Design a protein with these regions (language model features):
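Extracytoplasmic/periplasmic, Sec-exported soluble proteins
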Residues: 30, 34, 38, 64-71
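Bacterial signal peptide processing site
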Residues: 22-25
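C-terminal motif of bacterial Sec signal peptides marking the signal peptidase cleavage site
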Residues: 16-20
């Protein structure tokens, strides 16, 4: 009898392990990685919803001046209510994951992409330090000017031992956090953009916004970025469109 109970308990444990129930949602591997299958499922759901609703998209309402790559966030509640999606992807923020699902080119060819919310949290953390500094000082803690109106951070004034960075969702490289003249924080994607210019075929020229090279060719968008263009074969800040 004891042997039988032991086998039953062992079987239940195996079921729990295989189903992932022994692990918190935040620790399950599908929450931590971009998943092409999950992207495809959401893409199909978007298209089904669009067909059902005369071209309308299931997106959350944002202010008009919201940066382009953070503007068209997928509304999973709307997708589920329309029966276009049975469950929220486990790697989505709404499902306990690290990513926010967003759309690019929604007007003519809506495509599903990801924002890595760990970078969002990194920006928010530095902003807390920055706001504390600005409560006591007139000007933001400018470091070195790397382009007209774009600065590194005087990180020591913010209480950091080293320059704050984020981990790139594109390359895994550490990307610097930079600041404009108003004290707005951005991620500097020049490392990733240089890699993309070398890797992907393109016809971009000076004055074009080359961030789309990343958005078009990877599962991610370059969130929290200033616009960039190409100059002498290298990525450069596209300063005249800094509000995009």
């Amino acid at each position: 009898m004891a042997y039988t109970y032991g086998r039953i308990i062992l079987g239940l444990l195996l079921v729990l392990i295989l189903s992932g129930c022994l692990y918190p949602d935040s620790e399950r591997s599908e929450n931590k990685q971009p998943n092409e299958q999950q992207l495809a499922i959401v893409q199909n759901a978007i298209e089904e919803f669009r067909e059902q609703n005369n071209g309308l998209l299931p997106i959350k309402t944002k202010e008009n001046d919201t940066p382009i790559f953070q503007k068209y966030l997928v509304d999973f509640t709307a997708l589920k209510e329309a029966n276009a999606l049975s469950e929220i992807p486990p790697n989505a923020y709404e499902g306990g994951g690290y990513y926010q699902y967003t759309l690019i080119t929604p007007e003519d060819n809506p495509r599903v992409k990801l924002i890595d919310l760990r970078n969002t949290e990194s920006i928010r953390s530095v902003n807390v330090q920055l706001n504390g500094y600005r409560n006591e000082h007139i000007y933001p803690p400018y470091g070195r000017e790397i382009a007209e109106g774009v600065y590194t951070l005087d990180y020591e004034s913010l209480g950091y031992d080293a320059m704050p960075t984020v981990v790139s969702p594109f390359s895994g490289e550490n990307l610097p956090i930079v600041m404009d003249v108003e004290g707005q924080l951005y991620i500097d994607y020049r490392i990733d953009l240089k890699n993309a210019l070398d890797k992907y075929e393109h016809n971009y020229s000076k004055g074009d916004d080359i961030r789309w090279l990343l958005a078009e060719n990877t599962p991610f968008v370059p969130a929290y970025s200033l616009p960039y263009t190409i100059q002498d074969g290298e990525p450069a800040f596209l300063l005249e469109e800094a509000n995009e």
